[in-house]
């Protein structure tokens, strides 16, 4: 099959943009399944992200395609992921290729983001861009597993179709391996763990830095046998001057001891190599995250509350900061001595990669169902990262 996947490579580095990573990982997986796969991009600017994408496409045998070239390729399926496909554009492509199918691949919590936009007037840039486009009604909507609970039926509502289903989660070690090859990061080497990194973007309640900071502060207060040299709030530079935020941070013993600092968002390899020996994370209704897989694949400890990947890193329950404290304490105390961690983590994470041939086959079946107009809603199994018809 000829498959096109939209990607926006005009702004963010691949190491920071989860959506662009998702597009490339999906393209690699579909290529593994024997499909002729293209990344469809809008802009062709000389940016760091574009350079990264060109190199990775060349290395892994992926094709790039401009939007105005889509009609000539006679694609069987176009997957809208990084860039929304308008109904006008879709109709133009259908005029030249009546059998073309459209899939909307959803990897963001649109319900939360829309609610925050309407109630708190946040995410205004996104709202403005979306208001300019009427998206095509897709032949199917695919949701990543962590969005299923809050968004599956919301996607049906906003896109005007009942053909919405969960699909397996995809990750790939390619970016971490590229960072290793270029010496941007190294495998965790057993060094003493005394620098903590928190990497929540702080643009939505879904990923907010205060809960993991509370967990780290509890360890600092209650466990004097653990040395914490620094707590880095990566991605908190946009809120660090907010009065309420400063009030919350000011209550923390780590802050009073001069051990906290805030910085802009950075790529995971950069943080792991330069600033953090361990990552502490918190999420709400986003229980799978590339950050956890990136860090664990490199052998670093990552403490998180994502229930769909409990066997990745070190898991604590939901909003239970006492449990988080216990888990972080044990990780800081014992991780350096765990010689099996790297191999075990890579074994656990493999189910999310194109090395999982069962997942490769499942995506081919899902594609064929769309082409044949045979929609089937799927049920997700987090232990195997697989789906089966409901």
Regions found by a protein language model. Name each.
Residues 7-10, 20-137, 150, 263-267:
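Extended catalytic core of nucleotide-activated donor transferases of GT-like folds
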Residues 14-29, 208-215, 362:
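Conserved alpha-helical elements of sugar-nucleotide-dependent glycosyltransferases
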Residues 15, 150-153, 158-259:
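Conserved catalytic-core segment of nucleotide-activated headgroup transferases in glycan assembly
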Residues 36-43, 104-105, 142-143, 229-238:
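Short internal beta-strands
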Residues 65-67, 237-298:
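Donor nucleotide-activated moiety binding/catalytic core segment of transferases
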Residues 112-182, 363:
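A short, active-site helix/loop in glycosyltransferases that binds the activated sugar's phosphate group
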Residues 274-354:
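Catalytic binding pocket for nucleotide-activated donors in carbohydrate/polymer assembly enzymes
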Residues 335-389:
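A charged, aromatic-enriched C-terminal amphipathic alpha-helix characteristic of glycosyltransferases
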């Amino acid at each position: 099959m000829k498959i096109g996947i939209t990607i926006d490579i005009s702004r963010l580095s691949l190491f920071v943009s989860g959506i662009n990573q998702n597009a490339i990982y999906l393209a690699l997986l579909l290529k593994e399944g024997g499909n002729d796969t293209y990344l469809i991009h809008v802009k062709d600017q000389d940016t760091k992200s574009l350079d990264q994408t060109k190199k990775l496409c060349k290395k892994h045998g992926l094709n790039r395609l401009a939007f105005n070239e889509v009609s000539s390729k006679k694609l069987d399926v176009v997957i809208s992921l990084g860039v929304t496909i308008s109904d006008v554009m879709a109709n133009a492509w259908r005029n030249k290729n009546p059998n073309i199918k459209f899939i909307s691949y959803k990897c963001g919590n649109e319900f939360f983001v829309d609610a925050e936009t309407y109630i708190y007037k946040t995410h205004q840039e996104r709202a403005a861009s979306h208001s300019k486009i009427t998206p095509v009604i897709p032949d199917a909507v695919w949701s990543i597993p962590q969005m299923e609970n809050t968004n599956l039926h919301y996607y049906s509502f906003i896109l005007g179709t009942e053909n919405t289903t969960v699909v397996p989660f995809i990750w790939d070690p390619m970016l971490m391996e590229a960072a290793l090859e270029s010496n941007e990061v190294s495998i965790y080497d057993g060094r003493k763990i005394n620098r903590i990194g928190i990497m929540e973007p702080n643009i939505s309640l879904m990923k907010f830095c205060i809960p993991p900071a509370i967990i780290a502060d509890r360890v600092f207060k209650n466990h004097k046998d653990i040395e914490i040299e620094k707590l880095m709030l990566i991605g908190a530079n946009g809120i660090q001057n907010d009065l309420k935020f400063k009030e919350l941070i000011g209550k923390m013993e780590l802050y009073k001891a001069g051990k906290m600092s805030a910085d802009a968002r950075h790529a995971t390899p950069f943080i792991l190599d330069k600033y953090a020996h361990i990552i502490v994370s918190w999420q709400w209704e986003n229980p799978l995250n590339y950050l956890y897989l990136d860090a664990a694949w490199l052998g670093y400890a990552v403490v998180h509350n994502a229930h769909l990947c409990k066997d990745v890193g070190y898991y604590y329950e939901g909003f239970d900061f006492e449990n988080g404290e216990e888990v972080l304490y044990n990780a800081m105390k014992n991780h350096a001595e765990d010689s099996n961690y790297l191999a075990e983590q890579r074994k656990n994470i493999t189910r999310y990669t194109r090395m999982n041939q069962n997942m490769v086959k499942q995506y081919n079946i899902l594609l064929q169902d769309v082409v044949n107009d045979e929609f089937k809603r799927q049920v997700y199994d987090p232990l195997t990262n697989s789906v089966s018809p409901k």
